[in-house]
């Protein structure tokens, strides 16, 4: 895993050409950067960092989702929290209240009658908040796309950050979606493909 930061002025070389949000690749430049940071910690006893970068780093390890299980995708979402996949190890702990949550996982078919309740729960969540759309039904209506009573994608109600495809998607797919959301948060709400 690369270090993401702006190298201190004491570190010269190719690192000065690295943008502040780009990871510093492992090697002598990263080693020099880490030594400079350790020296600064020993000299001053504290480290100066950008607050928003520090908050984004902290948020990646403490995502508290509001689970909104509406259909068969909810069973796979439950599997992701069990011992085999264990989303808790990534700091993802489900919360019973939207006021305590910062992520909403919408798993399943959203009907027109459920849409106002979904929006109300989303509005009750504190900022910053993210949405994971799980499964074909939540992504675009799925099997029931042409039904008069089905919303053709949860993104018509709330803004979606991560789409997890599948019918139903596996627990591994949800874990991957959560990891992608953590990467997006860490990179300042923009997903950089690697």
From Swiss-Prot:
GO CC annotations on file: plasma membrane; respiratory chain complex I
InterPro entries noted in UniProt: NADH_UbQ_OxRdtase-like_20kDa (IPR006137), NADH_UQ_OxRdtase_20Kd_su (IPR006138)
Disulfide cross-links: none
Obligatory cofactor(s): [4Fe-4S] cluster
Cofactor binding description: Binds 1 [4Fe-4S] cluster.
Location of region: Disordered: 1-24
GO biological process terms on file: aerobic respiration; electron transport coupled proton transport
Bilayer topology term: Peripheral membrane protein
Database matches in Pfam families: Oxidored_q6 (PF01058)
Residue sites binding [4Fe-4S] cluster per the record: 72-73, 137, 167
Keyword check for Cell membrane: yes
Chief location of this protein within or outside the cell: membrane
Keyword annotations from UniProtKB, A to Z: 4Fe-4S, Cell inner membrane, Cell membrane, Iron, Iron-sulfur, Membrane, Metal-binding, NAD, Quinone, Translocase, Transport, Ubiquinone
Comp. bias regions, Pro residues: 1-11
Location(s) in or outside the cell: Cell inner membrane
E.C. designation(s): 7.1.1.-
SUPFAM superfamilies noted in UniProt: HydA/Nqo6-like
Catalytic activity field: a quinone + NADH + 5 H(+)(in) = a quinol + NAD(+) + 4 H(+)(out)
A molecular-function term among this protein's GO annotations: iron ion binding
UniProt xrefs under PANTHER family: NADH DEHYDROGENASE (PTHR11995), NADH DEHYDROGENASE [UBIQUINONE] IRON-SULFUR PROTEIN 7, MITOCHONDRIAL (PTHR11995:SF14)
Quaternary structure and interacting proteins, as annotated: NDH-1 is composed of 14 different subunits. Subunits NuoB, C, D, E, F, and G constitute the peripheral sector of the complex.
Family: Belongs to the complex I 20 kDa subunit family.
The protein's name in its UniProt record: NADH-quinone oxidoreductase subunit B
GN (gene name): nuoB
